[in-house]
Amino acid sequence: MMNGKIDIKNLTLDDLIAFLAGKGKERYRARQIFKWLYQKDARSFAEMTDLAKDLRRDLEETAVISDLEPEAMEVSRDGTRKYLFRLEDGNTVESVLIPEEDRTTLCISSQVGCAMACEFCLTGTFRLTRNLTAGEIVNQICAVRRDVPVRNIVFMGMGEPLANLDNVVKALKIILHDDGLQFSTRRVTVSTSGLVPEMERLGREVTVNLAVSLNATTDEVRDRIMPVNRRYPLRLLLDACRSYPLPGRRKITIEYVMIKGLNDSLEDAKRLVKLLSDISSKINLIPFNEHDGCSFKSPDQGAIDVFHSYLLSKHFTVITRSSRGSDISAACGQLKGKLDKNVSGI
């Protein structure tokens, strides 16, 4: 609620149908409003000219259309863009747009801060402040699309998406709906550090791609760098990956942050092959992006090449991700801090 009014951007189409039914309005009105919000980017009810004036007046009295505008934006040497959004309560989140030859990918946030405390991640050094609403999640996409076209959406920004599953699922239903933002399920990926029960629920409620931040091949190492592993160790996590419902020939993305001397050896590569032998997956190797919040180091190029080559020799689909946006602290594991501090003059 905002000033006693409902934020209409927090409503799925079914929610909006129910909201309007309480006003005695027809179901098709909800579809009209949805299209105005997400396909015509309406930011006021007055713009919705195919709605009766009395309905527009009623909506203005009982509802608001929330919005986000970037407070700041930085552009990396490689074209990556980082957007800072200030929320209604003064908190901030960041989104990152990654341009590639044939597409653009928008990395969006789902929480202010993060409670997962992954040792290699700068965002994890900021305590969780709160969950984002569905509207705050969706509005990141709406705002960036006013600047540049967006083809892919990844929930890999600030926060653990599955720790805010109610609002993330609502946002996904808006993102995927034909009357909403109209993204194909193939173009939307949700990343998790490994919240097993929530992985199962996500698979039941929506059809999206799944990325799992694995980063270790033994429980001993994963316990150290990802506290979530103490609750859901590798055995449970990999079982959840095996049972996650993906249509057709799609694969789960396994994200593997390579850290020098910790998880970058040939033996790690061999264990990874065994762990994933019966899971339909593709592997993203992510050389660790060094930052002031952590003493870990990036792996040597030779170690990366050996690791990559071994996975290829075992017929895995594998990509070694280049570091995008590291000069503006927009690379994997670097979100939150620098841009906000620059704006605030700290």
Swiss-Prot record:
Cellular location(s): Cytoplasm
Q: Which GO terms describe its molecular function?
A: 4 iron, 4 sulfur cluster binding; metal ion binding; rRNA (adenine(2503)-C2-)-methyltransferase activity; rRNA binding; tRNA (adenine(37)-C2)-methyltransferase activity; tRNA binding
Using the UniProt record, name the top-level EC class of this enzyme in a single word.
Answer: transferase
Q: What is its main location?
A: cytoplasm
Q: Which residues participate directly in catalysis?
A: 94 (proton acceptor), 332 (s-methylcysteine intermediate)
Out of the domains of life, which is the source? Answer: Bacteria
Identify which cofactors the protein needs according to its UniProt entry. [4Fe-4S] cluster
Paired cysteines (S-S)? 107-332
Question: At which positions is [4Fe-4S] cluster bound?
Answer: 114, 118, 121
Pfam families from the xrefs?
Radical_SAM, RlmN_N
Cofactor remark from the record: Binds 1 [4Fe-4S] cluster. The cluster is coordinated with 3 cysteines and an exchangeable S-adenosyl-L-methionine.
Reactions mediated catalytically: adenosine(2503) in 23S rRNA + 2 reduced [2Fe-2S]-[ferredoxin] + 2 S-adenosyl-L-methionine = 2-methyladenosine(2503) in 23S rRNA + 5'-deoxyadenosine + L-methionine + 2 oxidized [2Fe-2S]-[ferredoxin] + S-adenosyl-L-homocysteine; adenosine(37) in tRNA + 2 reduced [2Fe-2S]-[ferredoxin] + 2 S-adenosyl-L-methionine = 2-methyladenosine(37) in tRNA + 5'-deoxyadenosine + L-methionine + 2 oxidized [2Fe-2S]-[ferredoxin] + S-adenosyl-L-homocysteine
- Annotated SUPFAM superfamilies: Radical SAM enzymes (SSF102114)
Entry binding sites for S-adenosyl-L-methionine: 159-160, 191, 213-215, 289
What keywords were assigned to this record?
4Fe-4S, Cytoplasm, Disulfide bond, Iron, Iron-sulfur, Metal-binding, Methyltransferase, rRNA processing, S-adenosyl-L-methionine, Transferase, tRNA processing
Q: Which GO terms describe its cellular component?
A: cytoplasm
tRNA processing as UniProt keyword: yes
- Recorded family membership: Belongs to the radical SAM superfamily. RlmN family.
**Record function comment:** Specifically methylates position 2 of adenine 2503 in 23S rRNA and position 2 of adenine 37 in tRNAs. m2A2503 modification seems to play a crucial role in the proofreading step occurring at the peptidyl transferase center and thus would serve to optimize ribosomal fidelity.
Q: What other remark does the UniProt record contain for this protein?
A: Reaction proceeds by a ping-pong mechanism involving intermediate methylation of a conserved cysteine residue.
What is the protein's name according to its record? Answer: Dual-specificity RNA methyltransferase RlmN
Q: Which organism does this sequence originate in? A: Geobacter metallireducens (strain ATCC 53774 / DSM 7210 / GS-15)
